[in-house]
Each structure stands twice: as structure tokens, then as C-alpha cells.
Amino acid sequence: LSIKKQYLKLEEDLSEINVGLIRLAKPIPEHELFFSINEINTFKFKRVEDILIKGEYFDHSFSRYQAYDKSSKNCYNFISNKSIVSIQKKEQNQLFSDESNIKFLLNLHQDVDYILSNSDMFAEFSLILLPENFVFQTQEYPLSSEEELYQLIQYYE
């Protein structure tokens, strides 16, 4: 007599959010960038808990800055695309491991420096003034609920 397993199929969340991709015009330290951003906006970005991704060989941290705009009632998050710290947990002994000491949240967009998200379902990134001499124009990028970055943004919100 064999037991047949039955699975309850939950309603799938097929929603999508838009994030903004931020590319720096020139290399600049984070503290200078956010000092400049805070100077020209009414709301102020503060460093909050880093996003931590645990791997088999490395733990990667990504910096995160957050601000709340009282007029639009939106919470904005800047997340670094490239890991700022990688802590090695154990020695890699495989020749072709897919894990390295540097990780990108958006692997296909390694030229992106920051990912901008907000709490509103309809992202309006033009409300954030960015220093023109440091940052290129924000590019909107759709994220489906199946992507790892979507899950991370939802978890840390």
C-alpha cells in the first residue's frame, strides 16, 4: 500500500514592482553621495540595517539607506547592487564554484551602483532629487515576484 502525497496549491503572487537603477557618473564614497542627496531633498536618507545574503562559502552584505517623505507618504530605499562586505565562511575547494567573494543583486546589470525602491506600488522616482554631477538619470526596471531581489525588498520593507 503506497501513500499518495497531495499538495495544496496556494494562489500564486504574480505581482510586479518597479525599481529604479542608479548609475554613478564617477566613483564617489557613499557618505559623500548621500550627503549631497540629503542637501537637496526635504527628506533625509539614513543608513539602516544592511541586507545580508548567506551563501555556502561567503556571507555578503549590501548597504541600505532609507528615507520617509511626509508629503507623499512614501518610504524610499537605496540598496547597493554590489556587496560592500563579504565574509568567507569556509575555504572553496571546487574549481568551478558559482560563488565568489563579490556578489551583485542584479547580476545582469553589474554597471548599476544602487537599486532604488519605494513603498508605493506605483513607483515615482522623479520625486527624489539626485545630484546631477554624480548620478546619471534613473532607469526604471520591472521586478517580478519570482525574482530573488523582489523577495529581498519585500522582506526588508
Language-model segments: which ranges?
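Surface-exposed, polar/charged interaction patches used for macromolecular assembly or partner binding
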Residues: 4, 19, 91-100, 155
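Short, well-structured hydrophobic secondary-structure segments
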Residues: 29-74
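Glycine-rich, aromatic-bearing surface loops/beta-hairpins
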Residues: 111-157
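Short, surface-exposed beta-edge/turn micro-motifs
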Residues: 17-21, 104, 110-115, 120
